[in-house]
Amino acid sequence: MKFRFWTYLTFILLLAFITSSCGPKLPSKRILFIGNSYTDLNGGLDTHLLGFAPNSESMRITPGGYTLKDHWQDANTLDAIRSGKWDVVVLQEQSQNSVTNYYNFFEYAQKLDAEIKKAGAETIMFMTWERPDSTQYGVTAEAVNKAYTALGQQLGVKVAPVELAFSMALQERPDLKLYIDDGHPTPEGTYLTACVFYGFIFQQSPVGNSYGGDVSKEDKDFLQAIAAKALGQ
């Protein structure tokens, strides 16, 4: 009898140890990214997000230079949305268009959002960052933030504050290269973006996640902390 008791107690303690060592269990999510090269570069944002949350499923539709209008007119994009396969659909507008052609941005975000909701998924807008080659056209961090915030309020959709995370990172470390001269992200920029989406979609701080992508350990820890700070985590 005593042997059975100790065997049972050992089993319970072992089970508790295994459970606690596994950490929090994240729900499985199916995520579709719709955008262009900003989402596609450095192996794809969907790929990096799965590095943070490997139990999920993700895919991207990202032809170069595409606007949301182009996606609306593309049967491949609409078929993917209407498949009903996704829990979350992320929309990324062409990096200048949200500011220089806001009404076009709004019109096609609204149309795509309606299809996404009809298919039973949630829309999340990908707030891009300031383009260094387009500030003369008004594509500044402040203007991009204002455009996406206004759209989010008008459509009642969530906006992932990637631009805010970029601004915060560069304020603390102006030496860190998050994008090249035409605005396309470096591996560090893509990694920071993935950190933001991981925290935003799963409501779980990226800090301490073992996935490091293609960045150094120092940059990994810094960018995870910045993303968490931008998300208030």
Where are these predicted regions, by residue range?
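C-terminal motif of bacterial Sec signal peptides marking the signal peptidase cleavage site
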Residues: 18-21
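Conserved SGNH/GDSL esterase-like catalytic core that processes O-acyl groups on lipids
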Residues: 29-34, 38-110
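Bacterial lipoprotein signal-peptidase II cleavage site
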Residues: 23-29
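Structural beta-sheet core signal
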Residues: 33, 125-127
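A short helix->loop->beta-strand "cap" motif at the edges of active sites that frequently abuts
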Residues: 114-124, 157
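Serine-dependent acyl-ester chemistry module
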Residues: 88, 94-96, 100, 131-143
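Bacterial N-terminal signal peptides that target proteins for export
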Residues: 1-9
